[in-house]
Structure formats: structure tokens, C-alpha cells
Amino acid sequence: MRVMGKVAVCIFFLVAPLLAQVRFVTGAPPAAATGPVFEASAGYSYLALDTLSRQRVGLSGVDANGFVDFNSRWGMMVDSSYARVGNVLGTGHSGNVLSFLTGPVFYPAEYGNTRIFVHTLAGVSLVNSAVPVSGTYYLGGAVTRFSYALGGGVERTVSGPLAIRVGGDYLRTTFANSTAAMQFQNNLRIVTSIVFRFGRR
């Protein structure tokens, strides 16, 4: 729950400047009928990886997304991310997390060129990491399991089809403990990306 609290704080500080002037799209008149709007994005990802020793390991990497906005409120996204660190908890073993997720996106409010989004994603994540066992011994390897993410953020159009997205997620993954039993990991992910929009929303 501490991780969920951190995600909530991050999202609050991202959207707080908009709340005094926000316009809820549910009260807006319907726009003229248009087809779906496609978007693609790429950017930087930071992952605070939960370990079984309750220490967090910071991983850095890249994130790429594809979006389809069906209307002003709802869309779908496909998310792929890769983050890496050279040394996990002093074991000398590198660590990385590769995720492929998809799910719905909801846009509850917008103001001018800025809109707020929330999403629920599910898919698989591969976690390659290590767990200290005793002394200089450690258990290392890769685990691929079901994974999901809950989060949101802010998107702002900067010029023509270009926009900037900043968001945060609670990301649930799985890795082994020192006895090789599978355990859940509660991770925090922050993503900053450039968005290119194919069409007008």
C-alpha cells in the first residue's frame, strides 16, 4: 500500500496545477463524428524495483507505446518497456525488467491542450534479477509471469501532432526469493515520453 500511496502522490502533483481550471469531458457537447485517432510514443522509463530484502533498486530504460483513441474519453494502449541496472544488491548480477502490457485508457478531464489520463494494463513481465542467499552466494535468474499496471498522468500537446506525456504506474511483477519460491513485487514506474499523433482528436 505504501507503493500505491507514492503513485497517488506522483499523480496528484502532475495534475494539481490543472484542477482549478479543468473542464470535464463528460459535460462537453459531442464533437462531429470522426474516426479513431492513432498515437505512438517513446521515451525514458525509471523503475523502482521491489526486492525481497525490502530494498528498492533503481532501473533506467526505455518505454514505447501505441494508442488508439476511440473518442474524447476512451482509448486503448499497448505498452512495452525495458529497464536495466548493472548490479543488484551488491551481487554483481545485472538486473532488467521487460514488460508487454495492454489495456483501456480513460481521459476524465481536459483543459486546452492538456488532458489527464488513467489506465489499467495487463500482460506479462520478464524479471531478470538476483537474491542474496548467504555471504557471497546469491540466487539469480529470469522469471516470466502475469503482470499488471495501474496508473495515469498528464498529456500536453506542444505543437501540431507532437505532445509530451508524463505518467506514473504501480507495476506488479513476480520474482523468486532465496528459497526459489515465487513472490510478488510491488514496483513504481515513472515514464516521460514524446507522443506523435496520427490524425486530429
Where are these regions (language model features)?
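Short, surface-exposed tryptophan/glycine-enriched loops
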Residues: 153
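Bacterial N-terminal signal peptides
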Residues: 6-17
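Gram-negative (and chloroplast) outer-membrane scaffold detector with strong preference
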Residues: 65-136, 143-148, 156, 160, ...
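N-terminal secretory signal peptides that target proteins for export/translocation
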Residues: 1-4
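Internal, hydrophobic beta-strand segments that form the core of beta-sheet-rich folds
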Residues: 168-169
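Extracellular loop and loop/strand-boundary signature of outer-membrane beta-barrel proteins
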Residues: 49-52, 87-92, 133-140, 176-182
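Extracellular beta-propeller repeat domains
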Residues: 163-165
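Short glycine/proline- and aromatic-enriched beta-strand/turn motifs that initiate or cap beta-hairpins
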Residues: 20-70, 76, 82, 122, ...
